[in-house]
C-alpha cells in the first residue's frame, strides 16, 4: 500500500491514522463482523458500550452528537473519542404509488383514471417535505423534485420544485374539481416494516393528509414483521404505497430513471409498476448514448414526465452521519 500513490494528503487525512498502512498488503484486517441491529436505540447503546466500531448515527441522537448542523461537526465530548464522516447519500428516499392498484393507479375507465391521477397529485401536494426532513433527517437532508438525486451529475438544480412544496389549497381544489370527498375517497394502505420510526413516519403522513380533509380512518398502516416480508409483498404488487430508499450502483441518472422503466415492473426494480410510452421510448433511446448534454436533457425530460404523472412522492437525499 503506497500512501502517496493513493493521494494521501496529511492536511486532509492526518486524523484517520492511515500511516500504519504504508507498505502493507490488503486485506488490512483478519476479520470484519457486521451487526444488523434494527432498532436505533439498541444500535446506539451497543456503539456507546464499545461493542461496535462504526455506526450511522440515529437522527434522534443528532442533538447529542453534533455541535453544528452545517457543516456537521461533533460536540467536543464526542470529537475527543470518535471520527466523523458526514456525506450526502448517493441515492434518495421516496414513496411510490402502486399503479397496478385500481384504487389509486391505472383504471380501465378513462374518467376514473384521470380522477385517480388527480388524487395522487393532491396527496403529493399535501405532503410536507420540510417537516419530514426536519423530524426524521434533522433538517440536513436535501429535498429535491423527482427521481434524479443531487449526487447524479444529471441533477438539475433549476428543476421546478413545486412538486416538493406543500400546497394545501391546491390539493383541496384538485379533490373538489375531480369529485373526491370524504365519503368516496379510497382507503389508503401505507406499507412499512414494523419499527418505531416507520410507525412515526406513517402517523406523520396521516396527519399531512388530514389537513386536506382525508378521513384518518381511511389511511391505514399495512405493517410487516420484517423488511423481507415487506419486500416480498411489494414485489408481488400487494402494497398500495411503497416507501423505499435507493442507493445508486454508479453515479449516473440512468441508475435511477430505470426505477420507472416499464419493462422493470415488479418483481423488477419498478416498484410503482409505472408504464408510460414516451418515458420508455426515451429510456431506450438514451440507454446506448454516451454521457453528453443531449443525454442529460433526455434524462431531465424523463424526470419531468414522472413528476407530471404524480407517480411518486419524491424525494430526499439523507445526509448520513
Question: Could you describe each region identified by the protein language model?
Answer:
Residues 25-30, 117, 168, 172-189:
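Immediate post-signal peptide segment of exported/extracytoplasmic ligand-binding proteins
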Residues 79-81, 88, 117-121, 125, ...:
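Extracytoplasmic/peripheral linker and loop segments enriched in polar/acidic and small residues
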Residues 35-101, 130, 134-136, 143:
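Extracellular/periplasmic solute-recognition and catalytic clefts
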Residues 1-33, 38-42, 168-169, 173:
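Gly/Pro-rich hinge or "lid" segments in bacterial periplasmic/extracellular proteins
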Residues 1, 142-178, 192-200:
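Structural transition elements
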Residues 41-52, 67-69, 203-212, 228-239:
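Short helices/loops that flank or line small-molecule/ion binding pockets
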Residues 29-35, 185-194, 219-222:
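Short, well-ordered beta-strand elements
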Residues 31-36, 51, 102-113, 119-122, ...:
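Second-shell loop/turn segments in exported
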Amino acid at each position: 500500500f503506497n500512501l502517496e500513490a493513493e493521494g494521501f494528503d496529511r492536511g486532509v487525512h492526518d486524523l484517520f491514522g492511515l500511516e500504519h498502512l504504508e507498505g502493507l498488503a490488503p486485506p488490512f484486517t483478519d476479520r470484519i463482523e457486521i451487526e444488523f441491529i434494527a432498532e436505533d436505540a439498541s444500535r446506539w447503546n451497543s456503539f456507546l458500550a464499545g461493542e461496535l466500531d462504526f455506526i450511522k448515527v440515529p437522527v434522534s441522537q443528532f442533538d447529542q452528537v453534533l455541535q453544528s448542523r452545517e457543516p456537521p461537526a461533533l460536540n467536543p465530548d464526542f470529537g475527543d473519542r470518535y471520527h466523523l464522516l458526514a456525506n450526502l447519500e448517493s441515492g434518495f428516499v421516496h414513496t411510490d404509488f402502486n399503479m397496478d392498484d385500481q384504487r389509486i393507479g391505472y383504471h380501465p375507465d378513462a374518467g376514473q383514471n384521470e380522477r385517480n391521477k388527480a388524487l395522487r397529485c393532491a396527496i403529493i401536494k399535501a405532503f410536507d417535505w420540510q417537516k419530514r426532513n426536519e423530524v426524521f433527517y434533522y433538517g440536513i437532508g436535501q429535498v429535491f423534485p423527482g427521481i434524479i438525486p443531487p449526487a447524479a451529475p444529471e441533477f438539475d438544480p433549476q428543476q421546478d420544485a413545486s412538486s416538493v412544496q406543500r400546497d394545501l389549497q391546491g390539493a383541496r381544489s384538485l379533490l373538489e374539481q375531480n369529485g373526491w370527498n370524504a365519503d368516496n375517497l379510497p382507503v389508503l394502505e401505507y406499507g412499512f416494516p414494523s419499527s418505531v420510526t416507520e410507525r412515526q413516519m406513517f402517523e406523520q403522513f396521516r396527519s399531512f393528509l388530514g389537513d386536506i380533509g382525508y378521513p384518518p380512518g381511511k389511511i391505514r398502516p399495512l405493517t410487516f414483521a420484517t423488511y423481507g416480508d415487506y419486500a416480498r409483498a411489494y414485489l408481488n404488487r400487494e402494497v398500495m404505497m411503497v416507501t423505499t430508499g435507493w442507493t445508486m450502483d454508479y453515479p449516473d441518472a440512468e441508475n435511477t430513471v430505470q426505477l420507472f422503466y416499464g419493462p422493470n415492473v415488479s418483481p423488477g426494480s419498478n416498484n410503482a409498476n409505472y408504464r408510460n410510452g414516451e418515458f420508455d421510448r426515451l429510456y431506450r433511446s438514451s440507454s446506448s448514448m454516451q454521457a453528453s448534454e443531449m443525454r442529460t436533457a433526455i434524462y431531465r425530460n424523463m424526470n419531468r414526465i414522472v413528476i407530471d404523472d404524480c407517480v411518486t412522492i419524491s424525494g430526499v437525499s439523507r445526509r448520513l452521519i
